[in-house]
Regions:
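Transmembrane alpha-helix interface motif
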Residues: 1-42, 48-57, 142-145, 149-152, ...
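Membrane-helix interfacial "entry" motifs
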Residues: 14, 37, 60-65, 97, ...
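Alpha-helical transmembrane segments and their helix-start/interface "positive-inside/aromatic belt" motifs
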Residues: 25, 62-74, 249
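Transmembrane helix-loop junctions in multipass membrane proteins, especially transporters and channels
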Residues: 41, 45, 60-64, 88-96, ...
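Alpha-helical transmembrane segments and their membrane-interface exit regions
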Residues: 51-61, 75-79
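Alpha-helical membrane-interface segments at transmembrane helix boundaries
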Residues: 63-67, 71, 108-112, 202
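Loop-to-transmembrane-helix entry motif
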Residues: 69-77, 114, 118, 208, ...
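Juxtamembrane/interface alpha-helical elements of multi-pass membrane proteins
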Residues: 73-187
Length: 267
């Protein structure tokens, strides 16, 4: 499980994407997700796929490694597609069998929503693979620093985000240990029907939650012993410097959005 889910991991490579300011990457991902939500045509998603492929190549992330990260959420994507397939009506009636009907709009919307969620997962994964959790936390803290003046605990939220990202691989590793422990006791969770596999997976949740709470308590005690204060003013060892390449990254969103909208309205 931990080898499949890659979001939250960091690949320490030396590429042009890794060297970008984490604030610029965070802004780019946020605006790129907005562009994804405003894209409603297949050609628009093909264009966005080319952009993601280019970024992946520049970051030297193996394509198979990135696609493998979608496998844990593949069931969720298929479930989303099936919901739109049967619930979205309109267009040409393709199948009608009793109360079950499938229309062309259902297939189209199901595919687009599945692509939309998949692209959001991919661009978020690229962000975590090319940005260390510490830099990501610093970027979040710097971008939302003005919110401190309206009493929003930005530093605490940044720390929570950093801990959450670090806990994802840890929890997946813990889940792997629990699965191996259950298999050694004769439990079979990898075969049978989908309902049987889901039923066999439910008993794993209780020890996983207990382990998560124990790790959270240990971390809280360790931070308290070291004198951590969420309200204290903090400094950073690494100073973030905004450069021309970071500005160009943000400007590149203009043609990306323009082409996506043009393809959506033209075809």
């Amino acid at each position: 499980m931990k080898d499949k889910l890659i979001i939250g991991r960091f690949l320490p490579l030396d590429t042009v994407i890794h060297r970008l300011d984490p604030r610029a990457k965070l802004i780019f991902v946020f605006l790129f997700i907005i562009i994804i939500f405003f894209s409603h045509a297949p050609l628009s998603y093909l264009w966005l796929a080319l952009i993601l492929l280019t970024v992946t190549k520049l970051a030297r992330i193996p394509l198979w490694f990135l696609i493998k990260g979608l496998l844990p959420v593949f069931f969720f994507l298929i479930l989303t597609f099936m919901m739109h397939l049967f619930l979205t009506k309109g267009g040409t009636r393709l199948i009608e069998w009793g109360f079950i009907t499938i229309d062309s709009n259902g297939i189209r919307e199901g595919i687009l929503i599945m692509l939309r969620l998949g692209f959001i997962m991919i661009v978020s994964t690229i962000l975590t693979l090319t940005t260390s959790p510490l830099n990501l936390t610093d970027a979040f803290d710097r971008l939302f620093k003005p919110l401190k003046y309206i009493k929003i605990p930005v530093a605490a939220l940044s720390m929570m985000m950093s801990i959450a990202l670090r806990f994802i691989p840890t929890l997946m590793e813990e889940l792997d240990k629990i699965i191996l422990s259950q298999k050694s006791r004769g439990s079979d969770i990898s075969s049978g029907s989908l309902a049987a596999r889901i039923k066999a997976f439910i008993p794993l949740l209780i020890p996983l939650f207990i382990s998560a709470f124990q790790r959270a308590e240990e971390l809280a005690i360790a931070m308290e012993v070291r004198g951590y204060d969420a309200n204290a003013e903090r400094t950073s060892y690494r100073i973030l410097k905004w450069q021309l390449k970071d500005t160009l990254l943000i400007i590149s969103l203009v043609p990306i959005a323009a082409v996506s909208l043009w393809l959506g309205h033209t075809f």
